[in-house]
């Protein structure tokens, strides 16, 4: 290890970087403490207290994964993403979950309600892993998606940020829902017109083309396809029989 650290040749520039080995302290009794200190410098960031928390998870390079799926909407893929969103809401106690296309949003009222005590590094790494596992397991129900999972190894990235108040948290969801509606119009248009016909067209113009030339009324498309789906945790009253209670 020390030899590797001592010399490193730069093949492009043809010179060697030398690390002074005297600066490397190999004291066994505090090595672990030092390494943990270095780790903490980049992994100990905490969210701010008493502020809403918003998480967005995106499928990485899902344009490749979705190639060859039914257009404009593949119902198996839609079903899988809805299941992933529900799984995340259940596992993280999120106040609200929202899914559109290959994207999932989660929210908590404040940092104290978020998982992992609001540790940013944990939130981003674990939530991305949870989404990936749920997606893969749910894809296994469908042969077409199962084959894609085996070939492409899909995964998710995750970003976390906070809003100054609950109104802005709600606006974050409005932002994503508006994006979903624009994308839905575009996807339906791309399934019915050539790239040349759509070039330079606005969302409103594509919507009008669909109605006038193809007889497709965007309002007739199912809401969860054109605007996404919301999931929330609710309290329910359940009557338990004696056998269940025993």
Stretches found by the model and what they are:
Residues 4, 8, 17-246:
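Regulatory and interdomain segments flanking nucleotide-handling catalytic cores
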């Amino acid at each position: 290890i020390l030899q590797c650290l001592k010399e490193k040749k730069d093949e492009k520039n043809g010179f060697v970087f030398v690390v002074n080995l005297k600066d490397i302290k190999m004291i066994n009794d505090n090595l672990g403490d030092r390494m943990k200190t270095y780790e903490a410098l980049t992994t100990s960031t905490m969210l701010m207290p008493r502020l809403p928390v918003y998480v967005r998870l995106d499928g990485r390079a899902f344009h490749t994964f979705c190639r060859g799926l039914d257009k404009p909407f593949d119902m198996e893929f839609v079903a899988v993403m809805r299941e992933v969103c529900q799984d995340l809401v259940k596992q993280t106690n999120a106040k609200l979950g929202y899914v559109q296309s290959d994207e999932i949003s989660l929210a908590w009222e404040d940092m104290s309600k978020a998982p992992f005590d609001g540790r940013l590094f944990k939130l981003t790494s674990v939530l991305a892993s949870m989404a990936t596992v749920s997606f893969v397991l749910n894809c296994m129900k469908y042969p077409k998606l199962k084959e894609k999972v085996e070939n492409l190894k899909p995964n998710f990235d995750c970003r976390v940020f906070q809003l100054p108040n609950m109104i802005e948290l709600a606006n974050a969801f409005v932002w994503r829902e508006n994006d979903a509606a624009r994308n839905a119009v575009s996807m339906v248009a791309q399934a019915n017109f050539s790239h040349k016909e759509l070039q330079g067209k606005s969302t409103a113009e594509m919507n009008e083309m669909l109605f006038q030339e193809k007889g497709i009324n965007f309002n007739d498309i199912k809401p969860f396809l054109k605007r996404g789906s919301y999931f929330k945790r609710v309290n329910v009253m359940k009557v338990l029989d004696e056998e269940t209670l025993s």
